[in-house]
């Protein structure tokens, strides 16, 4: 599923009212009774799921930290009954037009502080790191507030001045005539970019941008139980904001390397072990590899090829609750010899004779079976 914030078309700092308005607008757009296009109903359900998760502070916090992996089925399908009125739809449609009743009426166009962009960092970790978690150092390139000008973008002793194009409003207005009447369209000032200010004497260190790109070392905590696709959020380590706005966040996307002998299946670990046919028949105690180190495994007498034995609590810790762990399931592979020595063959034929309930006839039958099995005549 797509990112929940993207589905609703809101930023990650959106408050409850913003989320609600966005949900109503999107839900109406994709409601199956209104939108008959293929895929509209699926998108309608996705939007409902996104709103249900993000409107609850606890599930939103888990989603922000771990993505969908952190939800663990905590939220179900959303009730779509509350569509709300048409006010938000009309507000969205008329946003940007002035005049009586227009959505832009009384709204300041000058840009204030803006939050910095979020950043993505892809990190590959070992299988054992994913199981037990670890603190790891990474280096990221990101924008930080310029320490020379303090983020103002201007040289020392100078500062921003009011934009002469928009008079400091950050917006310019343009009259448009339509069959429905005249409208005044409000657009961002092209000279100042909506800030209402221009910098006549820019800072040499940052070129008037107020930010500089640097490489920064971070130590991030990888929790136990993560998997490929898990997303970790590092608050405030994205790009620096503009005009005193807060920094964005850093999102670390994990990829887990495969293990040569162990394989993950949910919270369980799968592995195989080879035993001889005598160990399978008589039983034995062996050591097998686990993420906790070599562990003793009992092979019961009469173990059949393909039997799966369980090592309890040797699996993957549950993300967010590392005390709960899965199991390791060990499939027993019985190795048969391709050739037998004469004494081995004699002993096996004697065993086959004793085991047969039909005497000599069965003895000859089993003898032929061993010959075919081990390639001897």
Swiss-Prot record:
<dbReference type="Pfam" id="PF01556">
    <property type="entry name" value="DnaJ_C"/>
</dbReference>
<feature type="domain" description="J">
    <location>
        <begin position="3"/>
        <end position="67"/>
    </location>
</feature>
<feature type="binding site">
    <location>
        <position position="163"/>
    </location>
    <ligand>
        <name>Zn(2+) 2</name>
    </ligand>
</feature>
<dbReference type="Pfam" id="PF00684">
    <property type="entry name" value="DnaJ_CXXCXGXG"/>
</dbReference>
<comment type="similarity">
    <text>Belongs to the DnaJ family.</text>
</comment>
<dbReference type="GO" id="GO:0008270">
    <property type="term" value="F:zinc ion binding"/>
</dbReference>
<dbReference type="InterPro" id="IPR002939">
    <property type="entry name" value="DnaJ_C"/>
</dbReference>
<dbReference type="InterPro" id="IPR008971">
    <property type="entry name" value="HSP40/DnaJ_pept-bd"/>
</dbReference>
<comment type="function">
    <text>Participates actively in the response to hyperosmotic and heat shock by preventing the aggregation of stress-denatured proteins and by disaggregating proteins, also in an autonomous, DnaK-independent fashion. Unfolded proteins bind initially to DnaJ; upon interaction with the DnaJ-bound protein, DnaK hydrolyzes its bound ATP, resulting in the formation of a stable complex. GrpE releases ADP from DnaK; ATP binding to DnaK triggers the release of the substrate protein, thus completing the reaction cycle.</text>
</comment>
<keyword id="KW-0143">Chaperone</keyword>
<feature type="binding site">
    <location>
        <position position="206"/>
    </location>
    <ligand>
        <name>Zn(2+) 1</name>
    </ligand>
</feature>
<keyword id="KW-0677">Repeat</keyword>
<dbReference type="InterPro" id="IPR018253">
    <property type="entry name" value="DnaJ_domain_CS"/>
</dbReference>
<dbReference type="InterPro" id="IPR001305">
    <property type="entry name" value="HSP_DnaJ_Cys-rich_dom"/>
</dbReference>
<dbReference type="InterPro" id="IPR036869">
    <property type="entry name" value="J_dom_sf"/>
</dbReference>
<dbReference type="Pfam" id="PF00226">
    <property type="entry name" value="DnaJ"/>
</dbReference>
<feature type="binding site">
    <location>
        <position position="189"/>
    </location>
    <ligand>
        <name>Zn(2+) 2</name>
    </ligand>
</feature>
<dbReference type="GO" id="GO:0051082">
    <property type="term" value="F:unfolded protein binding"/>
</dbReference>
<comment type="subunit">
    <text>Homodimer.</text>
</comment>
<feature type="zinc finger region" description="CR-type">
    <location>
        <begin position="133"/>
        <end position="215"/>
    </location>
</feature>
<keyword id="KW-0862">Zinc</keyword>
<feature type="repeat" description="CXXCXGXG motif">
    <location>
        <begin position="203"/>
        <end position="210"/>
    </location>
</feature>
<dbReference type="GO" id="GO:0006260">
    <property type="term" value="P:DNA replication"/>
</dbReference>
<feature type="repeat" description="CXXCXGXG motif">
    <location>
        <begin position="146"/>
        <end position="153"/>
    </location>
</feature>
<keyword id="KW-0235">DNA replication</keyword>
<dbReference type="GO" id="GO:0031072">
    <property type="term" value="F:heat shock protein binding"/>
</dbReference>
<feature type="binding site">
    <location>
        <position position="203"/>
    </location>
    <ligand>
        <name>Zn(2+) 1</name>
    </ligand>
</feature>
<keyword id="KW-0479">Metal-binding</keyword>
<keyword id="KW-0346">Stress response</keyword>
<feature type="repeat" description="CXXCXGXG motif">
    <location>
        <begin position="163"/>
        <end position="170"/>
    </location>
</feature>
<dbReference type="InterPro" id="IPR012724">
    <property type="entry name" value="DnaJ"/>
</dbReference>
<dbReference type="InterPro" id="IPR036410">
    <property type="entry name" value="HSP_DnaJ_Cys-rich_dom_sf"/>
</dbReference>
<dbReference type="GO" id="GO:0005737">
    <property type="term" value="C:cytoplasm"/>
</dbReference>
<feature type="repeat" description="CXXCXGXG motif">
    <location>
        <begin position="189"/>
        <end position="196"/>
    </location>
</feature>
<dbReference type="InterPro" id="IPR001623">
    <property type="entry name" value="DnaJ_domain"/>
</dbReference>
<dbReference type="GO" id="GO:0051085">
    <property type="term" value="P:chaperone cofactor-dependent protein refolding"/>
</dbReference>
<dbReference type="GO" id="GO:0005524">
    <property type="term" value="F:ATP binding"/>
</dbReference>
<feature type="binding site">
    <location>
        <position position="149"/>
    </location>
    <ligand>
        <name>Zn(2+) 1</name>
    </ligand>
</feature>
<dbReference type="GO" id="GO:0042026">
    <property type="term" value="P:protein refolding"/>
</dbReference>
<feature type="binding site">
    <location>
        <position position="146"/>
    </location>
    <ligand>
        <name>Zn(2+) 1</name>
    </ligand>
</feature>
<keyword id="KW-0963">Cytoplasm</keyword>
<dbReference type="GO" id="GO:0009408">
    <property type="term" value="P:response to heat"/>
</dbReference>
């Amino acid at each position: 599923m797509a990112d929940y914030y993207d589905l609703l078309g809101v930023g990650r700092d959106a408050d409850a009212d913003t989320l609600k308005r966005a949900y109503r607008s999107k839900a109406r757009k994709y409601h199956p009774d209104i939108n008959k296009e293929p895929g509209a109903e699926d998108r309608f359900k996705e939007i409902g799921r996104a709103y249900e998760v993000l409107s609850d502070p606890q599930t939103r916090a888990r989603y922000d930290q771990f993505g969908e992996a952190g939800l663990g089925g905590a939220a179900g399908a959303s009730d779509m009954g509350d569509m709300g009125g048409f006010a938000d739809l009309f507000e969205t449609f008329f946003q940007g037009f002035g005049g009586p009743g227009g959505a832009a009426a009384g709204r300041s166009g000058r840009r204030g502080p803006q939050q910095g962009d979020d950043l993505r960092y892809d990190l590959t970790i070992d299988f054992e790191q994913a199981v037990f978690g670890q603190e790891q150092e990474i280096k990221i390139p990101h924008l930080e507030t310029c320490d020379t000008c303090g983020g103002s973008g201007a040289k020392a002793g100078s500062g921003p001045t009011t934009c002469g194009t928009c008079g400091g409003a950050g917006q310019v207005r343009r009259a448009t005539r339509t069959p429905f009447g005249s409208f005044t369209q409000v657009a961002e000032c092209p000279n100042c970019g909506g800030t209402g200010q221009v910098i006549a004497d820019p800072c040499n260190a940052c070129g008037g941008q107020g930010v500089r790109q640097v490489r920064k070392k971070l130590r991030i905590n990888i929790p136990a139980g993560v998997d490929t696709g898990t997303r970790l959020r590092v608050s405030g380590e994205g790009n620096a904001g503009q005009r005193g706005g807060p920094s964005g966040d850093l999102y670390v996307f994990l990829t887990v390397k495969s293990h040569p002998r162990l394989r993950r299946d949910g919270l369980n670990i799968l592995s195989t072990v080879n035993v001889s046919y005598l160990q399978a028949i008589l039983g034995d105690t062996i050591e097998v590899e686990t993420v906790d180190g070599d562990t003793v495994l009992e092979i019961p007498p009469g173990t059949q090829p393909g039997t799966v034995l369980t090592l309890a609590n040797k699996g993957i810790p549950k993300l967010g609750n590392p005390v709960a762990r899965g199991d390791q399931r060990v499939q027993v592979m019985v190795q048969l010899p391709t050739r037998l020595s004469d004494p081995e063959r004699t002993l096996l034929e004697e065993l086959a004779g004793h085991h047969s309930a039909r005497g000599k006839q069965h003895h000859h039958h089993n003898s032929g079976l061993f010959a075919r099995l081990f390639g001897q005549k």
